[in-house]
A protein has these predicted regions:
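Divalent metal-coordination and catalytic microenvironments
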Residues: 3, 19, 29, 62-63, ...
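Beta-strand-turn-beta hairpins that frame and shape the catalytic cleft
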Residues: 1-3, 21-26, 122-131
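A short catalytic or substrate-binding loop motif that flags glycine-/basic-rich loops and adjacent residues
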Residues: 9-13, 135-140
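Metallo-beta-lactamase
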Residues: 86, 90-139
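Metal-dependent catalytic neighborhoods of phosphoester/phosphodiester hydrolases
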Residues: 69-77
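Histidine-centered catalytic micro-motifs
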Residues: 58-68, 134-139
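Conserved small/polar residues in nucleotide/adenosyl-binding loops
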Residues: 143-144
Length: 144
């Protein structure tokens, strides 16, 4: 297995981590960089925003913008997994903001196709077995 930290190793916010195994890719989080970040980098990544997407998936750990803020850039054919409660909370937020922020409407559209999971219940994607574990991170049911 290969683990690649595309962004987030030297900064807070905007994290994107990729796990690769036998041609499969599991990306974890695709967030916005925090305001005041010295260099804004829009990520255009093989297997996530371009190229062969057939063996790729995205897992969102929780609904903070620095973890979920760019999922509207992910093509619809890539499955997005996210905790059920987090999906519902972000849908409410995006629904309220969509009239003043077009990006929120795009986030909402992408969330409508998200695949919910429950903490403590394992699920699989390709060769990856994922066991969401609850952790406290200033939102209810953040997972790692």
């Amino acid at each position: 297995m290969e683990i690649i930290i595309h962004r987030g190793a030297t900064q807070i916010g905007g994290s994107v981590t990729e796990y690769r195994h036998n041609g499969w890719r599991l990306f974890v989080d695709f967030g916005e960089q925090l305001p005041g970040t010295p260099v804004y980098v829009q990520l255009d990544m093989e297997g996530l925003t371009k190229g062969d997407l057939s063996k790729s998936a995205m897992l969102i750990t929780h609904y903070h913008g620095d973890h979920i803020g760019n999922i509207h850039q992910i093509p619809m054919e890539i499955p997005v997994f996210m905790g059920k409660l987090g999906i519902e909370i972000q849908k409410i937020t995006s629904n309220h903001l969509k009239e003043v922020d077009r990006k929120q409407a795009c986030l909402l559209e992408r969330l409508n196709k998200a695949i919910p999971f429950e903490a403590g219940t394992a699920f699989e994607f390709g060769p990856f077995e994922i066991m969401p574990i609850v952790l406290d991170h200033s939102d209810r049911k953040s997972v790692v």
